[in-house]
Regions:
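Short, well-structured N-terminal submotif of metal-dependent ribonuclease cores
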Residues: 1-40, 54-67, 136
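Short beta-strand scaffold positions
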Residues: 10, 39-40, 76, 95-98, ...
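Alpha-helix capping/helix-boundary segments
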Residues: 14-15, 44, 81, 100, ...
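Structured helix-beta-strand junction loops
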Residues: 34-35, 71-72, 110, 128
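Acidic catalytic patch
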Residues: 70-91, 98-102
Length: 136
């Protein structure tokens, strides 16, 4: 059914919980299991691989991270999205978080959930009316 809310947006604070030991990972896995359409900004790929590198993951675990990323539709930023991200409120929102937020906002009513564990980003997303969740 076109236009129905079926997309789940993941920011890096959510995805990292799936490959770095975290007590909330199981709740997130359960939340995501029935939801096949996962999306994020293209910058998620870099953020996730940097986090995995900082965590010192082994090559097999790095392959798992890449497999997780391959299961997410990544949306590239263009100049218009960059401009939109640059003026989002609040002014204290960090640049990469504003890119995540602008990308999620671009999905409109198709967005079923915006998954983040970053409180500042969650607050901003709620202010814009996004359906924020942090399964725990």
């Amino acid at each position: 059914m076109p236009g129905r809310s079926d997309l789940v947006y993941l920011d890096s604070s959510a995805l990292v919980r799936l490959f770095v030991p975290d007590p909330g990972a199981l709740a997130l896995q359960r939340f995501l299991a029935p939801r096949a359409r996962r999306v994020s900004a293209l910058l998620l790929r870099t953020e996730a691989l940097r986090a995995a590198t900082r965590a010192g993951l082994s090559p097999p675990r790095m392959a798992l991270v890449r497999a997780l990323l391959d299961g997410i539709s990544l949306i590239p930023a263009d100049a218009a999205l960059g401009d939109e991200a640059g003026v989002l409120r609040p002014p204290e929102l960090r640049s990469l978080d504003s890119l995540h937020l602008a990308t999620a906002l671009s999905l409109g009513p198709r967005l079923a959930a915006f998954v983040t564990y970053d409180e500042r980003l969650a607050d901003a997303a709620r202010w814009y009316g996004l359906p924020v969740t942090s399964p725990s």
